[in-house]
Amino acid sequence: MLKNDINTSHITIILFTAKGAPDSIIDGYDCGADDYIVKPFDTDLLLKKVKNIISTGENARKKFNFADIEHSKNIYSDFDKKFLEDCVFVIKDNLQDSSFTVEILAENINLHRKTLLRKFNALTGKSPIDLIRHTRMSKAAELIKEKYRVNEVALMVGYEDTGRFSKAFKQFHGVSPSVYIQ
């Protein structure tokens, strides 16, 4: 089933069928269909439904916030939510690794790099590197608030070069780590 495959679970499924009995429609939705259209159908109605599905997906991607991954029960299917949570888990588990890349993330969740990029973008409108950066910078802000020194924080979130870390921190938070401390 498409909705139970990590490679395709994010794809919208619309069933076009001549079976209009309520039991058939229920079965279609139980199988994971996002919409069920009985033939013959009105072309204008079909176009409206497709436009609405597309705009709903675009709106969800525009509103997407990495902090919402753990609170996104209604936005994603259970399968897609688990995929995003797995990504977050792997990133957090490798936070200190300065050589951690999207390729390593893909390998850890058993997907090809291109499939990971395509799926992640389809769900969030962003790239996995954005999630890696967000996770690192959010953790860095927490550690700075806990009074760790900037060079310690840099190492703890996967930056070997404190200057590069400070630049990335400022770009993400709008202020340098030393200003953020105050």
Where are these regions (language model features)?
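Short amphipathic alpha-helix used as the core "switch/output" element in two-component signaling
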Residues: 1-9, 131-134
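Alpha4 helix (beta4-alpha4-beta5 surface) of REC/receiver domains from two-component response regulators
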Residues: 9, 20-35, 48, 152
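C-terminal output helix
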Residues: 24, 41-50, 54
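The C-terminal output helix
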Residues: 51-66
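Basic, amphipathic alpha-helical hairpins
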Residues: 88-100, 120, 124, 141-149, ...
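Basic/polar phosphate-binding segments, predominantly the helix-turn-helix DNA-binding elements
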Residues: 102-131, 156-176
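Terminal helix-turn-helix DNA-binding modules in bacterial transcription factors
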Residues: 122-160, 182
